[in-house]
């Protein structure tokens, strides 16, 4: 009796266990069904002729471990652990290319991503099929930060073409790619030289002074002014900008692309990124406001003045113009942030490689002495007579590749690339780092060797496969400015100083810090005046 009675609920007991178990069972059944349907969908995608790649997991795809806490990531993906925690994603993707081929794919959730790892596939996609491969992916994190405006992240189409055409022609008007910009760069170097001399023979980090100088050249074009290196607001904005680019690829921030409201979480990198955005926005909008108040239609001083005048002209012609103060803000942000960070890191890599290779540095010094001397300021007209110096800069760019995965592209329609089916809306990553370390193109690709850019007569070789600024319709708009800054600033630095690592210091890590750009790890140098 007792045993039988024990199987029945006692009198007055609330029988709630059964319904709860049914609810849990139903939820598990739905989850299992979702996983099964997702698995079937992924199998159909793989069977549709897309490029090969690692087997995705249901719901999360291949890189779902990025959404997990670090201690849970081990052995999650392909049983190999989180290798991207110790190497940059560009390096890890290059390793995957050895397994799956130069065109391979993976999934982030349901999002198909195709990686192009050799020059031929990148050229075919970005040049020969430029109209198809020139769009930008719609990602919530980028959309929140840029409102899909500006130049770098805006969608490819008539509005983007119009804005880019105006921006490029206006920058050229103020000296982009012309000798008229030289005096501004040389003038800025005088401040760099003075700052470096303050340290005497003591070790120091070259990052702040180089960042200030490069940013000021952008400021002279866009804002019509330079900022003193001691300006607290300017220094704060540069620090925020550098930090923002570094954390934008923080694995937790990827959650925003799945749940956009995560951007507003009051902790961690979410809170930090919002503060960075607020400070940079305030800085740039104040500058635009000052220009609106002082605008002289007969005497435009800089890019902002020209844009404001053009905006008014367009509004007078028609109501539906795409030129407005909001779009100006995002274009200025693109020029200021992208233009500062990439060139700053390129120059820092140059100083690091010179410090590690005194023999190369000596040859650069000798060529400068022979062509320019120690008293005259360098000029772009000297480039043709300085092939070794130019080759040295190019070799640093090849090895450092400050934008290793370019900016992601997206297909605007279904297409075929080297026999593989590429669906509409596919994210495309050109692995520029992989191209510039390709042993098929570059002999001993990991060695620092400026001579690879010189012919038997010591003259500069123009190599088609050297594409640090990308190729196609989305090629970096600031390429000409960056080349001017790199040459004039690097030659000025080499003309004035000899750079070395502090005595007894360890060799810096040369893999770089992976973010939206590949920055060198913090390092110190000593300088001796020449």
From Swiss-Prot:
Gene Ontology cellular-component terms listed: cytoplasm; endoplasmic reticulum membrane; intracellular membrane-bounded organelle; mitochondrial inner membrane
Classification via SUPFAM superfamilies: Cytochrome P450
Entry-linked InterPro entries: Cyt_P450, Cyt_P450_CS, Cyt_P450_E_grp-I, Cyt_P450_sf, Cytochrome_P450_fam2
Class of enzymatic activity (EC top level): oxidoreductase
E.C. no: 1.14.14.80
Binding-site list for heme: 476
Keyword NADP: no
Tissue spec: Specifically expressed in thymus and brain. In brain, expressed in cortex, cerebellum, olfactory bulbs, pons and medulla and the limbic structures (at protein level).
GO biological process: omega-hydroxylase P450 pathway; organic acid metabolic process; xenobiotic metabolic process
Top-level taxon in the UniProt lineage: Eukaryota
Cofactor(s) listed in the protein's UniProt record: heme
Ranges annotated as spanning the membrane: 21-41, 99-119, 247-267, 328-348, 481-501
Main location: endoplasmic reticulum
Assigned protein family: Belongs to the cytochrome P450 family.
Reported function: A cytochrome P450 monooxygenase involved in the metabolism of arachidonic acid and its conjugates. Mechanistically, uses molecular oxygen inserting one oxygen atom into a substrate, and reducing the second into a water molecule, with two electrons provided by NADPH via cytochrome P450 reductase (CPR; NADPH-ferrihemoprotein reductase). Acts as an omega and omega-1 hydroxylase for arachidonic acid and possibly for other long chain fatty acids. May modulate the arachidonic acid signaling pathway and play a role in other fatty acid signaling processes.
Protein name (database record): Cytochrome P450 2U1
Source organism of this protein record: Rattus norvegicus
Taxonomic placement: Eukaryota, Metazoa, Chordata, Craniata, Vertebrata
